[in-house]
Amino acid sequence: MNNSKISSRLGFVFGLIIAASTAWADETCNSPYMSGLIKGQEDFIHVWTLGEKGLGDGSDKLVTIDVNPSSGTYGKVIGSVSVGGRGEAHHMGFTDDRKYLWAGGLDDSKIYVFDVGSSPGKPKLVRTIADLPAKSGFVGPHTFYALPGRVLIGNLSNGADKGGVTGLALYNNKGAFITKYDIPTGTVGGVKGDGYGYDIAVNPSKNVMLTSSFTGWTNYMRSLNEVVKDPEAMKHFGSTVVVWDLKSMKPTQILSVPGAPLEMRWALAPGQNWAVTAAALTSKIWLIKQDSAGTWAAKDVATIGDPAKIPLPVDISITADGKGLWVNTFMDGVTHYFDLSNPEHPRETYQKHTGRQVNMVSQSWDGKRVYITSSLLSKWDKSGADNEQVLRAYRWDGHALTSSFEVDFNKEQLGRPHHMKFTAKPAAQVALLDRAK
């Protein structure tokens, strides 16, 4: 098939994407094209976990934890699926039908597809995709973003020099490569791109996609202590957010956001067409918003902790009403809550020390349950007694976090817990269980 036919077909597909009805998933950072919104109690958390040499089988694995308080195994690990190797497990994402989880390795660039739809409490590994480097030239698959019938993958690096210049790869839900999109290195709208990648966030109503930027394999697979002491290495972190036309998949603007902007979160309330991101190296929250002329702009609106101490903000999670934002800072182990009632002026209203190192944060759709995990990257995690590897669950009443349970992944011989995704039992199964009680 020639390029013109491919472009024509993709244009049609992305036209359908913009027109598609949307539903946000349980945890508030997922693709708007996800089905099966869990508005009530989630039953399971699946944790994509880095293998640790000498701990258990040493392999990366998908760990499943029962998180329903009415269950007899509440707060317990009820299963794990090992992939038989260690490739720096990091992030994962659902397909649009919510039946499959795609999970990637930042080191080996393999993608593992787990069936979580057939029996959510017992995931099965059904496919391994190993052709990303050969098909796209990219390595380090990070973000798995559901589109109708497709998965868009945001990558961190490339196979040529293992630096930060990279792009996006598009696959269909069956695991077949379709095409790729380079993140711009040239000038767009008067701002020069760095070509770096990280997260993906789509606003269908605005026909806009945002991508953020981190660093390449040569940095993230190196000791953090070495990286921060190497002036040359510190030059190789992203400093841009790219604005894309979703239908054409072409960049329309490049926004200057210094300090490695990581997770992107659109406000979810109807009509709230703004997004936020946190810059890891500068400890800043940035607001991305359209002006009256239709131009997108990035604005530094808040500081997280004391930037001089390099708290290293990592994951963020926006509330369903867009009025609150959780931020985890890795180095000091603090979970912060910001009031976003006025996104131009976020205010930190609460913080809690939740671990010796904390990374990912996920919340239920109703905002009443918050979960954190500890691991960032195998070469960046702390050592000795500070190398805490846990999942901690909390209740949130709008004023304070109260502990519900925790799982010690070191004690359980599982590894380093990173990304979390929620699932729930099928409604029919829940009804049968309720009648049996």
Name the predicted role of every residue range.
Residues M34-D57, G154-V165, S212-H236, T373-L391:
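Short, conserved, GDST-rich strand-edge loop motifs in beta-rich repeat architectures
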Residues D26-V67, T73-L106:
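Beta-strand-rich domains and repeat architectures in extracellular enzymes and scaffolds
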Residues V116-P204:
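Asp-box/WD-like beta-propeller blade repeats and closely related beta-sheet repeat scaffolds
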Residues T95, G190-N342:
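Beta-propeller domains
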